[in-house]
């Protein structure tokens, strides 16, 4: 159950950080969106790894 709560916390943090950045920079700097999307992919990959580790610990 804790891993589910942690997952939602990670998603909420990502949304809180990424969405304003996209809204703020999309009009002035289109190339910034590519960088933001790349960092979002990296963040989601890290979050996925963390969740897999937590589930593996829970299974033991």
From Swiss-Prot:
GO terms for molecular function: toxin activity. One of its GO terms (biological process) is venom-mediated paralysis in another organism. It is found in: Secreted. Induces paralysis 5 minutes after injection into blowflies (L.caesar), and then death within 24 hours. May have antimicrobial properties, like most ant linear peptides. Keywords: Antimicrobial, Secreted, Signal, Toxin. Belongs to the formicidae venom precursor-01 superfamily. This is U20-myrmicitoxin-Mri1a. Residues 1-24 form the signal peptide. GO terms for cellular component: extracellular region. Its main location: secreted. It comes from the Eukaryota. It comes from Manica rubida (European giant red ant). Residues 25-34 form a propeptide.
């Amino acid at each position: 159950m804790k891993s589910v709560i942690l997952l939602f916390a990670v998603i909420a943090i990502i949304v809180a950080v990424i969405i304003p950045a996209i809204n703020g920079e999309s009009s002035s700097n289109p190339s910034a969106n590519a960088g933001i999307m790349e960092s979002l992919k990296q963040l989601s990959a890290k979050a996925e790894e963390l969740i897999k580790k937590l589930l593996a610990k829970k299974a033991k």
